[in-house]
Amino acid sequence: MKNYIRGLQKYTPYLMPIYLPNINSFRRLFATWGTPKNTKWGVGNRSCAFRIPSVEEKNMRIENRIPGSDTNPYLVFAANLASGYLGIKNNIKPSLETKNSAFEDVDPSIPKNIDESLSMFENNEEINEIFNEKFIRSIAAVRRMEYQAYLSVISSWEREVLLLNV
């Protein structure tokens, strides 16, 4: 279980195009207080990215609190399994459990924008091996196309506020 958690901790930053699929996902992550911006884990600790709600064996599970409702649940599940598998396969030991609030903790390994997340996603050999390079390139191409379309739109806020500053 602990190697699985460490796999989540290590590989989540590389899987952000799955966990945070669009510009609003990144807004939610970095603009709200209730979303973990870290790769910490804790028992019953909602401020951690990876929460173990109960340590009773029959109820034990790990919640990944980074993905939102705008994700593809099948891809998120596959990404979680892949991360955990790599943690077990590589026998990676997890960090210590976080018992205090981690809401203020921002992990520097978490990409801050779509471009950074796509670069990390495309360049991790282990992730490419598990998900297949063609799949990785396809996801990255779609995310880039969506982001470019977003950047080409002038918002009503820009028209209303910035036009007055000219």
Language-model features, listed with the residues they occupy:
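Active-site capping/gating regions of soluble enzymes
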Residues: 1-98, 102-107
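Acidic, glycine-enriched catalytic cores built around paired aspartates
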Residues: 102-166
